């Protein structure tokens, strides 16, 4: 076993159970471990939603228990400039972005890594993400693999990492299943053992999304229409809706043509007219896509894919893998054709590609290729 005692690891301590157990495991493995707590959002007056102070207290308690030093850093300015402004601009453009992916790219594995490197003299950083690393024996570049716990795997959120970042990052809980992580935390008497997982977007926390968004983007109400142009109801703003969405349309009791009582789903956003197009039934052809065009590509190996390739793709988190074919357009854009039509492919979200357990990388969905019935 290699001697880890000369290697310094800076663990991103969030105040949650995963980072707590990560710090414990690395200490057990003999590393010199220190924690770093990031504050990425300046609190507003919504104190009941903002858990930063509570998270910091929990992170400090865990570090005290483990006997490691906790550093603190404020990345709120970087977060605003590199994550939040993009998030708003995408919503303004009628798309549905994923800020957690951008946060990993710009903050956790860029600003954090640079600070750990330059100020704290780290050999590695570590996070409580459920992914694994693989170092091929032939000396090839390191790969990122799905986490062992398929239900918690977070490789979808980390596809923007390069092989250099993968080589510098440790993911101790990626080798474990979640119940085991909680069991370790409990055994070690860590205050975070029973703390529930955070579910909200990092800067919104658990507060109501529509309320939060309306503070920054003025809502423009408009019509909800059927594909034939019949007005079905009103929406409060296109930005509050995403393709394939069923809840929140408030037209549930409305029957369609021929007394159709199936539920309504968002099929399209007509930005020019500020109209939401809704259709009935989850199998409606307008909800289906044959594929997608993706841009802003990131490949873990850094080499663009230049040949047609069979693999699988996820177009949203916790989705079953979709068998597909990648057809390169150029180094910046690819066409992806699904083996079978897929529903709720959403521009602005990420398409992430896999071969087996290996995460190849991904890109932003620019547009979907609409389903055409044979």
Curated annotation (Swiss-Prot):
Residue numbers spanned by region Interaction with tRNA: 152-154, 316-317
Annotated disulfide bonds: 103-202
One of the protein's GO biological processes: tRNA wobble position uridine thiolation
Active-site feature positions: 103, 202
EC number assigned by the record: 2.8.1.13
Listed Pfam families: tRNA_Me_trans (PF03054), tRNA_Me_trans_C (PF20258), tRNA_Me_trans_M (PF20259)
Chain sites annotated for binding ATP: 12-19, 38, 128
GO cellular-component term (any): cytoplasm
Keywords associated with the record: ATP-binding, Cytoplasm, Disulfide bond, Nucleotide-binding, RNA-binding, Transferase, tRNA processing, tRNA-binding
Similarity-based family: Belongs to the MnmA/TRMU family.
Function: Catalyzes the 2-thiolation of uridine at the wobble position (U34) of tRNA, leading to the formation of s(2)U34.
Protein name in UniProt: tRNA-specific 2-thiouridylase MnmA
Organism: Vibrio vulnificus (strain YJ016)
Lineage start: Bacteria, Pseudomonadati, Pseudomonadota, Gammaproteobacteria, Vibrionales
Annotated gene: mnmA
């Amino acid at each position: 076993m290699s001697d880890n005692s000369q290697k310094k690891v800076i663990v991103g301590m969030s105040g949650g159970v995963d980072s707590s157990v990560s710090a414990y495991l690395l200490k057990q493995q003999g590393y010199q471990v220190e924690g770093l707590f990031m504050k990425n959002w300046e609190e507003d007056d919504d104190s009941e939603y903002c858990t930063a102070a509570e998270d910091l207290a929990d992170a400090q308690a865990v570090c005290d228990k483990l006997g490691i030093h906790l550093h603190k850093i404020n990345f709120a300015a970087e977060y605003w400039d590199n994550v939040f402004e993009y998030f708003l601009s995408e919503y303004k453009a009628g798309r549905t972005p994923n800020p957690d992916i951008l946060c990993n790219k710009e903050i956790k594995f860029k600003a954090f890594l640079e600070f750990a490197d330059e100020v704290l003299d780290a050999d590695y950083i570590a996070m409580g993400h459920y992914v694994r690393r693989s170092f091929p024996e032939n000396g090839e570049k390191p790969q990122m693999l799905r986490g062992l716990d398929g239900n918690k795997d977070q490789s979808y959120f980390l596809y923007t990492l390069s092989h250099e970042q993968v080589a510098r990052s440790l993911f101790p809980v990626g080798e474990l299943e979640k119940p085991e992580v909680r069991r370790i935390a409990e055994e070690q008497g860590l205050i975070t053992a029973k703390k529930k997982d955070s579910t909200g977007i990092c800067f919104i926390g658990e507060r109501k999304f529509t309320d939060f968004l309306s503070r920054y983007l003025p809502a423009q109400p408009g019509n909800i229409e059927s594909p034939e142009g019949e007005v079905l109801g009103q929406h409060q703003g296109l930005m509050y809706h995403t393709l394939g969405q069923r809840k929140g349309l408030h037209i549930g009791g409305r029957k369609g043509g021929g007394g159709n009582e199936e539920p309504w789903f968002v099929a399209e956003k007509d930005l020019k007219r500020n109209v939401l197009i809704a259709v009935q039934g989850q199998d409606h052809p307008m909800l289906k896509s044959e594929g997608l065009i993706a841009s802003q590509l990131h490949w873990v190996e850094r080499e663009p894919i230049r040949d047609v390739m069979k693999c699988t793709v996820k177009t949203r988190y916790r989705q079953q893998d979709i068998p597909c074919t990648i057809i390169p357009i150029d180094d910046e854009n690819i066409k992806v054709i699904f083996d079978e039509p897929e529903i709720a492919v959403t521009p602005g979200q990420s398409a992430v590609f896999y071969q087996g357990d290996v995460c190849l990388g991904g890109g932003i969905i620019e547009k979907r290729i609409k389903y055409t019935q044979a």
